[in-house]
């Protein structure tokens, strides 16, 4: 696994899904063990930041022998998000910290997956001693990256216009959260999905999951 060549001081594990399984001989346990090896490569002063809502990550933590903190929506998370609300492309939530007052976060990004990612950033910044107001300001100014819910523009059509969104989501779980974000942005609009499979092996291994997900869409 190429990510074992990375040697960060802080490592965030957002989730562990069955992906790139050819690398792990089709063995999910081998994939999990590789993540554990990656975390054990952290220096003694390093930190693992773990999304506690993911059951695989939660189980992995019980075997981890490095300093770690957790984040998520669960009440026992060290850094917890609640009061999540989305209006259009913006998302607001409260980020609760182990010590001190919660931080009000206003993101220029839609979707609960971006809340999770922002909460991980809050946890890291807080551990590094960044002031809460600077954390909030920095996250509010972040507008995302290319091909991650990227608005390509509006196309005129017979009954008005169509918003075109490009997203690199290529795993069923990623596609699902992207579609959820789109529905939350435009709850009263039709959703038309154009999906391009990526990698033969991924499409083969996750074919049934892709079919189930995309078949649930009306168009």
Q: What do the PLM-derived regions correspond to, one by one?
A:
Residues 4-163, 188-189, 215:
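Acidic, Mg2+-coordinating active-site environments of NTP-dependent enzymes
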Residues 107-109, 166, 195-197:
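Short glycine-centered, acidic/aromatic-flanked micro-motifs in structured strand/loop junctions
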Residues 120, 170, 174:
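Conserved cofactor-binding/catalytic machinery of classical short-chain dehydrogenase/reductase
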Residues 23-29, 169, 198-203:
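Short, flexible loop segments at the rims of nucleotide/cofactor-binding pockets, characterized by
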Residues 1, 163-170:
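Switch II (G3) loop of P-loop NTPases
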């Amino acid at each position: 696994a190429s990510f074992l060549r990375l040697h960060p001081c802080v490592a965030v594990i957002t989730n562990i899904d069955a992906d790139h399984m050819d690398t792990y001989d089709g063995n999910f346990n081998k994939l999990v063990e590789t993540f554990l090896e990656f975390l054990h490569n952290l220096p003694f002063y390093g930190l693992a930041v773990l999304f506690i809502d993911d059951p695989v990550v939660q189980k992995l933590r019980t075997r981890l022998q490095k300093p770690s903190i957790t984040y998520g929506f669960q009440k026992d998370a060290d850094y917890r998000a609640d009061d999540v609300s989305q209006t259009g492309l913006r998302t607001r939530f409260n980020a609760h910290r182990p010590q001190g007052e919660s931080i009000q976060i206003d993101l220029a990004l839609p979707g609960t997956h971006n809340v999770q990612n922002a909460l991980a950033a809050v946890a890291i910044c807080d551990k590094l001693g960044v002031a809460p107001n600077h954390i909030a300001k920095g996250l509010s100014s972040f507008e995302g990256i290319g091909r991650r819910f990227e608005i390509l523009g509006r196309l005129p059509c017979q009954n008005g216009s169509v918003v075109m969104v490009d997203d690199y989501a290529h795993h069923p779980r990623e596609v699902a959260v992207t579609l959820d974000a789109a529905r939350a942005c435009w709850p009263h609009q039709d959703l038309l999905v154009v999906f391009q499979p990526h990698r033969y092996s991924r499409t083969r291994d996750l074919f049934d999951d892709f079919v189930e997900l995309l078949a649930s869409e009306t168009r």
